[in-house]
Structure formats: structure tokens, C-alpha cells
UniProtKB/Swiss-Prot annotation:
Organism per entry: Christiangramia forsetii (strain DSM 17595 / CGMCC 1.15422 / KT0803)
Protein keywords: Ribonucleoprotein, Ribosomal protein, RNA-binding, rRNA-binding
The protein, known as: Large ribosomal subunit protein bL20
Function per UniProt: Binds directly to 23S ribosomal RNA and is necessary for the in vitro assembly process of the 50S ribosomal subunit. It is not involved in the protein synthesizing functions of that subunit.
Any one biological process term the GO annotation gives: translation
Length: 114
């Protein structure tokens, strides 16, 4: 019995990977084995960095809140502690946005928690 191969599916699978490798430099864009490795590595980086993005933004928000709170005479930890005890339910993202785009509103929050 002759060997059965599914060339249609094989070609479709390879075309899919080569399409994902579009824009790569050199053999990474058109040689199947090299492109497959490059796309696999790119997918790993994308997965890892989707997780890291959340951490990076949180640290950016903390830096912005800290800078704005220090201008008002409080450290970040003091400000967040007083914010929690005064039952103000604003998260770090909103606080950082207030600190950047409307400093007078942030200053009002600081005065309220002092």
C-alpha cells in the first residue's frame, strides 16, 4: 500500500507560518525551518511580554503617583496607607491619570487624606 500524505494540509500549515513570518529579515521570512523557529520564538516573546506589560504599567503608575505625592509632602507608601484608611476606592491607574492630567484633582485627594 502506498504511503498516504496530506500535501494540502501540509502546504496550508507551512503557508500559515510563512505568512506569520512576513516582514522578517533574510531567510527567516522564506525558508520553512528557519521561519518556523523564528515564529515560535516570536510567539513565546509575545506571550511573555503580555504578562510583563501588566507589571510594567503598574510600576509606571506607582512612579507617577509617588512623584505627585512627594510634591505634596507625602511618600507613596504614606499616601497609599492614608488613602486606604480614609476609604477612597481609587485604583493606581486612576490616581496616576489624575496625577498626570489633572494635578489639582490629585492635590484635592491628597488634602482630603492628610
Amino acid at each position: 500500500m502506498p504511503r498516504s500524505v496530506n500535501s494540502v494540509a501540509k502546504r496550508a500549515r507551512r503557508k500559515k507560518v510563512l505568512k506569520q513570518a512576513k516582514g522578517y529579515f533574510g531567510r527567516r521570512k522564506n525558508v520553512w525551518t528557519v521561519a518556523k523557529n523564528a515564529v515560535d520564538k516570536a510567539m513565546l516573546y509575545a506571550y511573555r511580554d503580555r504578562k510583563a506589560k501588566k507589571r510594567n504599567f503598574r510600576s509606571l503608575w506607582i512612579m507617577r503617583i509617588n512623584a505627585a505625592a512627594r510634591q505634596e509632602g507625602l511618600s507613596y507608601s504614606q499616601f497609599m496607607g492614608k488613602l486606604k484608611t480614609s476609604d477612597i476606592g481609587l485604583n493606581r491607574k486612576v490616581l496616576a491619570d489624575l496625577a498626570m492630567n489633572s494635578p489639582e484633582a490629585f492635590k484635592a485627594i491628597v488634602e482630603k487624606v492628610k
